[in-house]
Amino acid sequence: MPEKKRCQMERKENKARFCALSEVLADWKWLLTYSRRCKKMIALYIALGVLGTTVGLFGSVAGKYLIDIVTGYDTARLPLLVFAAIGSTAVSIAFDCVVSRVLKKLEIDLNNNVRADVFDRILDADWQALHAFSCGDILNRFETDTGAVGGGAVSWLPQILVTAYRLCAVFFLIWIYSPVMALIALGGAPVVLLLSAAVLKKRRAFENKLRRLGSEMTAFEAETFYTIDTVKSLGTMQSQSRKLKEKQEALRACSLQYNMFSVRVNALLRVAGAFTQFTAMGYGLYLLWTRAITFGTLTLFLQQRSSLTSAFESAAGLIPKFLSTAISAHRVRELCELPKERHGKTALPQGALMVELKNVTAAYRNGEAVLKNVSFAAGPGEIAVLVGTSGAGKTTLVRVLLGLVYPESGRAVLRGKNGCEIVISAETRCAFSYVPQGSTLFSGTIAENLRMAKENATEEEMTAALKTACAWAFVSSLPNGVNTKIAEHGGGLSEGQAQRIAIARAVLRGAPILLLDEATSALDEKTEAQVLKNLLTALPDTACILTTHRPGALKYCTRLYKAENGALTCIEVNKPA
């Protein structure tokens, strides 16, 4: 290979290694912001760890002198040394108990803090940015990676400081008795440091791949369970099972590759440790043979050499944990650093509102415009109906109204009675009572589902809302009425019943704009007609927007819009009855 090309490749590798290290450090800088929230407890944890190490060393020195007494070298201080040995053991046990308690409290508090923060960030994330992640991937990061972040924030700094103190204390204790033995015991350190630095990039690549494969498998499992009815009805159980096994095999292969890599690295570290151990033992036996040290001192040397090696192994073990936690922190950071929703700063006017879109063009990220220069309006007491084929832009228009998708051009506003305009954003979402396609009920009682719209709703208010949605007849016939429990997605109810409860929940919310996205699709024509009549009667000052494929709703509309190829045409405008 030409010298110039080889130098270019080396520079490229060094640059990649530097970038990887910079990213890891940035992830840890973000993670340690959580450590600052519990800095007093972490300081206590560190202090207890240092004191526990000191007590352990004190006990080792006491043991050295006890051995010398037994072997006849020193008999004058037997009572004191027995007391010191017993006392150090008792104190060590007490420290272990306190440290365990402090650590558990720290872990719980920080894990809860991290999970709560990530949960809130996800809820406030921009809708389009969030949809770059599958639900399974988000769940995997939320369940697995947040725990690693919390654990790292709790234990990383204390482990570094306590391990560093332990290394220094043991080294200087050995140095007091024999500087040569101390240097021999320290001999494995360069191997540990050099080897750990050399494998940094490869460890990070393995960790990244394992997390990605784990997220893919969780996403596949979540999607399968969510669509279990479809899987069963299509008879694709064996196909799904086969796909899961393929993903498991990919994860297994990667895990075994990483394991083999770790085995080789650990074997090299063990060889270096064994060489140091035999060298130290040989030198110690030589000193004992020449009567330069006592048998108790040799025991102390071997014990502390083992302790020093253990401390180095702990330090070496921190490096894979450092990388693994950094990967988790990076994955959580990706969720926390998603762009936030746009929040308006103007308070909504009281009373009825009119919604208006003027020459709006909207598109999804990295895609063509779905809405092209459309205009739309719906005022108090009106029912504006959107019709059109699938993919024509109806759902996108609904998302614009809800502040989930932002216009690239044009204006989307709410107008109050006094003529003031407010730009639609996440902040204006409270002006809408929204009933989306499909079942949107949660597990719990019917009353709990209704009170999601209004927490302090009375029995009378819930009954009135259910009557408006033509749901009171079947709800009142249930054994426990509104206190009847239902499963997730409305399990235990028919699709039409679930839709009517969702409409009742929207009515109970009392927002000035009611937005129904195919929300009557599961109702028969007679029930659909009655629901629309009830809405006009019960909500005279509410603007109602309805997307539908069915002709039955058209006779109740005051504005009819047809969506086609991204355009929106107002077909007819009738005055409210």
For the regions a language model picked out, list residue spans one by one.
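Hydrophobic alpha-helical segments in the permease module
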Residues: 84-96, 189-193, 197, 262-278, ...
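Helix-to-loop junction immediately C-terminal to a conserved catalytic motif
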Residues: 402
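Transmembrane helices of ABC transporter permease
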Residues: 37, 41-54, 84-88, 92, ...
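ABC ATPase nucleotide-binding domain helical subdomain, centered on the C-loop/LSGGQ "ABC signature"
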Residues: 116, 334, 411-413, 447-488, ...
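An intracellular "coupling" helix at the cytosolic face of ABC transporter transmembrane type-1 domains
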Residues: 32, 37-40, 127-128, 144-153, ...
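Membrane-integrated ABC transporters
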Residues: 1-55, 71-84, 99-103, 107, ...
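ABC-family ATPase nucleotide-binding domain "signature/switch" substructure
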Residues: 396, 438, 449, 468-469, ...
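Cytosolic ends of transmembrane helices, especially the final helix of ABC transmembrane type-1 domains
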Residues: 233-236, 260, 307-335
